[in-house]
C-alpha cells in the first residue's frame, strides 16, 4: 500500500510538472485584449497555454527584479525600445539562441545580444488638419521648429517615453546642441500646454485648437471610423533625409524562467507571417517581418522611408534625451 502511495504521489508530481511546462506567463504593459486573440491561436497550434499579467512597465520590471527566482514571469513584453533596453540593463532578460528569430527580425529591430526582439513597428510622424493646411506645407520634424508654426503646434508631454525616444533618435542624427535648438523651437511654437496622450493631441488638432502635431500612427488609425475626425491627415516626415522615426513593441525571455524552451517557441511564433499579420492588424501597427500584410485601415497611407537607426540607441540615449528636454523647456 505504501509503495502504491509513493507511485501515485510521483505520478501526481510528474503530471503537475508537465502541466506547468505547457503553460507560460507573460508580464506585459500591453492591453490584454490586444494579445489574447493571437495567444489563443498559439494555444490551438501548440497546446501551450499563455497567462497574462498586465500593468505599468516600470512596476512590472521592478516586480520581476524583486521576486527574482520566485517570479512567475517567463516573458516580459512591452512597448518602446527604450523600455526594453532598460529591462536588459536591469538584467531581466536572458540571451536567446534562435536562428528563426535571427532570420525573421531585422538586426536594427532587436538587441545586439538577442535579449529582446521587436515584433511590431510603430511609426511616429506628422498629423495635420486639412481645414488649415495641405501636405505641401510640411517636410520634416525639424521644420516644425520654424517660427512660421508659432501658436499652431501641439505636442504630447516629454515625460512619456515616445517623445523621449524621438528626441534620442534626433540626438543620434544631429548631435545634442542642434537637437536642443530644434526642440526649443517646438516649445516656442506650442499653441497650448503639452498633452498627456496622443489621442488628446489629435482631438485638439481636429477641433482647431492647433493645426499640427507629432503622434504614433495607430492613434490616428483608431479614430478613422469617427466622421468628426475626417479633417485629420497624415504626413510622412523626413522622406528626403533620415526617414520617419520608427519604434517597436517587443519582448524578451525573463532570465529566471523555468520554461525557456516554450518561451522561445512563443517568440518564434510572434515572428511568423501568420502571427505578424494577425498581431499587426489587431494593434494597427506595422509588421517587422518583410512581406507580411498590413492593416487595411493604414494601407491607404502608402509606403514610407523609415529611419533605420538601431533601436537600442533609443534606450542608450534616453538619459540625454530627458536632460535635453529639460534644458529646452519641453515639459
Please identify what each model-predicted range represents:
Residues 285-331:
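An extracytoplasmic/periplasmic, membrane-proximal ligand-sensing/linker region
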Amino acid at each position: 500500500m505504501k509503495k502504491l502511495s509513493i507511485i501515485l504521489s510521483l505520478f501526481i508530481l510528474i503530471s503537475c510538472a508537465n502541466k506547468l511546462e505547457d503553460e507560460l506567463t507573460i508580464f506585459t504593459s500591453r492591453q490584454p485584449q490586444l494579445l489574447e486573440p493571437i495567444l489563443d491561436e498559439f494555444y490551438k497550434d501548440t497546446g501551450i497555454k499563455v497567462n497574462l499579467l498586465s500593468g505599468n512597465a516600470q512596476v512590472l520590471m521592478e516586480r520581476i527584479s524583486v521576486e527574482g527566482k520566485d517570479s512567475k514571469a517567463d516573458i516580459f513584453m512591452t512597448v518602446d525600445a527604450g523600455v526594453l533596453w532598460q529591462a536588459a540593463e536591469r538584467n531581466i532578460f536572458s540571451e536567446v539562441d534562435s536562428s528563426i528569430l535571427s532570420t525573421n527580425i531585422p538586426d536594427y529591430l532587436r538587441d545586439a545580444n538577442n535579449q529582446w526582439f521587436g515584433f511590431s513597428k510603430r511609426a511616429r510622424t506628422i498629423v495635420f488638419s486639412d481645414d488649415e493646411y495641405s501636405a505641401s506645407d510640411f517636410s520634416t520634424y525639424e521644420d516644425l521648429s520654424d517660427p512660421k508654426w508659432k501658436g499652431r503646434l501641439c505636442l504630447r508631454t516629454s515625460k512619456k517615453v515616445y517623445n523621449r525616444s524621438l528626441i534620442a533618435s534626433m540626438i543620434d542624427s544631429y548631435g545634442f546642441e542642434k537637437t536642443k535648438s530644434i526642440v526649443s523651437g517646438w516649445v516656442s511654437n506650442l499653441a497650448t500646454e503639452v498633452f498627456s496622450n496622443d489621442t488628446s493631441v489629435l482631438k485638439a488638432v481636429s477641433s482647431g485648437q492647433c493645426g499640427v502635431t507629432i503622434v504614433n500612427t495607430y492613434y490616428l488609425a483608431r479614430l478613422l471610423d469617427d466622421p468628426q475626425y475626417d479633417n485629420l491627415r497624415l504626413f510622412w516626415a523626413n522622406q528626403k533625409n533620415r526617414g520617419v522615426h520608427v519604434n517597436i513593441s517587443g519582448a524578451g525571455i525573463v532570465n529566471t524562467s523555468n520554461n525557456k524552451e516554450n518561451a522561445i517557441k512563443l517568440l518564434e511564433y510572434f515572428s511568423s507571417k501568420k502571427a505578424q499579420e494577425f498581431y499587426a492588424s489587431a494593434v494597427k501597427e506595422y509588421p517587422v517581418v518583410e512581406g507580411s500584410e498590413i492593416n487595411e485601415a493604414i494601407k491607404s497611407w502608402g509606403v514610407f522611408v523609415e529611419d533605420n537607426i538601431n533601436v537600442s540607441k533609443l534606450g542608450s540615449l534616453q538619459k540625454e534625451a530627458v536632460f535635453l528636454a529639460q534644458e529646452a523647456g519641453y515639459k
